Amino acid sequence: MSGTLYGLGIGPGDPELITVKALRLLERAPVIAYPAPEKGESLARSIVAPYLSGGAKKTEVVIRMPLVEARFPAAAVYDRAAEELGGHLEAGRDVAVLCEGDPFFYGSFMYLFGRMAARFTVEVVPGVSSLTACAAVLGAPLAARNDVLTVVPAPLDEAALKARLAGAEAVAIIKVGRHFAKVHRVLDELGLVGRARYVEHATMASQRILTLDAVSADGVPYFSMILVHQRGEAWT
């Protein structure tokens, strides 16, 4: 009998934000897998590290991701990972894939899901997303009353960003990173800099909350977000 593939949402960074269900499945799974940069440590692995010390030894599969936007190098990585994890599942071993935030909110797990769901039993365990975490640490509700919340990936080109932001009521700009200067420029053109809130590494020890004008464009990490409320504090 084949094992089950679990996509575990492990939250935005604070280990205490892992759900009870995700923790139970993590502790039970003999195999865990997680994304990591080509060089360096895995954020996902570091989030769950407090729960792995002292327990039964697990097989760990590190999925090294290239830092490029092109689709095909990443596709090859997911192909190889699906094959390796499939071997464990076919041998009857459950596999828990660790996903920062929520697996199905821009999560890398969806690419394994697309490759493996037709062959194996898959269970997706939702997690605390970066959206809700950033709103909480900023003390700024995502949306109020009948406001429409728009999620905008910062890698969009400048014209697309401007079009998405121009008429939006409440906006979360995600994956800011090296696109900060472009995003700042668009917000300035739309007169929204004063209504924007910036946070990086929300809920982590390295968390920082800054005004947009205080942010150095050269040092913005991938895990950063800008929340914008066109109507100001619509919840007051």
Protein language model features and the residues they cover:
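Glycine-rich, flexible N-terminal cofactor/catalytic loop recognition
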Residues: 1-63, 163-167, 215-216
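A contiguous loop/helix-start segment that scaffolds small-molecule binding in enzyme catalytic cores
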Residues: 5, 165-236
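Short acidic active-site motifs
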Residues: 21, 84, 157-161
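Short, solvent-exposed amphipathic alpha-helical segments in soluble enzyme
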Residues: 22-25, 49-52, 112-115, 139, ...
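Short, well-ordered alpha-helix to beta-strand connector turns
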Residues: 26-30, 92, 120, 168, ...
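General beta-strand structural signal in soluble alpha/beta enzymes
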Residues: 34, 62, 97-99, 124-127, ...
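Glycine/small-residue-rich loop that forms an oxyanion/phosphate-binding "nest" at active or ligand-binding sites
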Residues: 61-93, 97
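Class I SAM-dependent methyltransferase SAM-binding "motif I" and its flanking Rossmann-like core
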Residues: 101-167, 217, 230-234
